[in-house]
């Protein structure tokens, strides 16, 4: 790639990448001298939780002042150059450095490259031909390269969108970086159609300690999967973070817990941590599943009994008495085959009824006389498996500000198909 400012005397071009003297027994380190700094590359391994191995490495810039031999953080380095053209030139120089340092490495892995969106949006930025030539010069196929763009700095710019399309046509993959931080929104996912979305480290930090945040993270991952994206969770630095990533069903994980960035590729370093995370996940999943089944069994048995009693002519209050005796149970209701309620609710007791009715913030949702619940998982699950009790995942009920689960069963009563539902608060 040729920097946009190579022909400008104000921004001198970087020197070509060169092999520096390596430590004893090591391979030569490829570096680039640029405006008084020595640029080098470190590679952070990225693991597939499913494949149980490294599937790529992210190239991270390291810089040292040539005059003082003092390391300079990348953000400080970029802040030290004046003007967009200079930053564009530095961005291009770092890309060239990473390609040169990665050349000859494992062709079956991805190379993740950070590119500032302004570099791609700039009409004088590296064109698709220059990128293709730079890859070819280092014997790298476009399919090996994942171009990472920072989600928080994406421009609403036709030139940027065109460059993204050109990169994809060339064969590169596109990754949306730091999703879930700041003003993240799914419009950028819809617009750019990235193959990979990287969740910001703040997502895993919250999900590690907050069950509510963990549920949101899991649903975010599920939605991104449905959008056609693979999901990477950044910032895995602890056992708990690795376990959280597995629980949230993410695809890829980097992070110091699995391996620190280094000049050489070290994809095997994190396999022990990966095995440990899977061992914990397997043990905890088995325990959680057993406890959940034990906890739900009385509710399922009671809703099945209630359906038999209803079919035999009992009132909903009488039929659901046993279900409503269980801890957390709030109410039962009966739906027709279109999801409409056919009789009034059966409440656990007067107190439960009053508590549900007292949530004034949700008073506009209280009247369900014309409601249809056929879209809900508890209705669809029951309809798919008649006469077998179903249990939903926890969700926010429209009947008030609370999390609950619903137990449901479809059955026939006098020639009518009905679905009996029972809600219980968590």
Predicted regions and their residues:
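Extracellular/periplasmic ligand-sensing ectodomains of membrane signal-transduction proteins
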Residues: 331-385
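EAL-family c-di-GMP phosphodiesterase catalytic domain
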Residues: 1-38, 42-55, 62-69, 149-154, ...
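Sensory/regulatory domains in signal-transduction proteins
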Residues: 43-49, 54-66, 114-123, 183, ...
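A short, polar/charged loop-to-alpha-helix boundary motif
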Residues: 63-81, 260, 264-266, 348-371
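Short, small/polar residue-rich loop motifs at catalytic or cofactor-binding pockets
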Residues: 39-41, 326-329, 404-405
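Catalytic core of bacterial c-di-GMP phosphodiesterases, primarily the EAL and HD-GYP domains
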Residues: 87-159
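Extracytoplasmic/periplasmic sensory segments of membrane signal-transduction proteins
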Residues: 296-351
